[in-house]
Amino acid sequence: MKLSQPLSIFAILAASTVAVAVPQDDACAQCLTEGTFCEGFAGPVGTCCDGLVCENAPGVADDAHCIRKKKCLAKGETCVSIAGPVGTCCTGKCTFVAPDYSVCK
């Protein structure tokens, strides 16, 4: 019995030291990085880091990932190029200029 009492005290001391050494708040405060799964049918699993939003890919449901926030294109910026659509105009008006080239008006 004498050996088990010091062993129990040591176990309690070791457990309390580990509990104090591991900060719990930091684990909850970490944000999700680009490309990380963030929300599904069961709900959100975290918060995306600054500059990212949690969105599903077009045509996909219940499988959202953190992606960069989409910015609209200002007047005069190219909205369609030879490579295809570049983005959405802030005004909503993408005007044809030449084949495979349109700008925001």
Swiss-Prot record:
Subcellular locations according to the entry: Secreted
Main location: secreted
Superkingdom: Eukaryota
Gene Ontology CC terms: extracellular region
Coiled-coil intervals: none
Signal peptide location: 1-21
Function comment: Effector protein required for full virulence. Directly interacts with and functionally inactivates PG-inhibiting proteins (PGIPs). PGIPs are a defense mechanism of infected plants, that inhibit the plant pathogens secreted polygalacturonases (PGs) used to degrade the plant cell wall. Excerts its function by interacting with host PGIPs to negate their polygalacturonase-inhibiting function via enhanced dissociation of PGIPs from PGs.
Known partners and oligomeric status: Interacts with Arabidopsis thaliana PGIP1.
Protein name: Secreted effector protein PINE1
Protein's organism: Sclerotinia sclerotiorum (strain ATCC 18683 / 1980 / Ss-1)
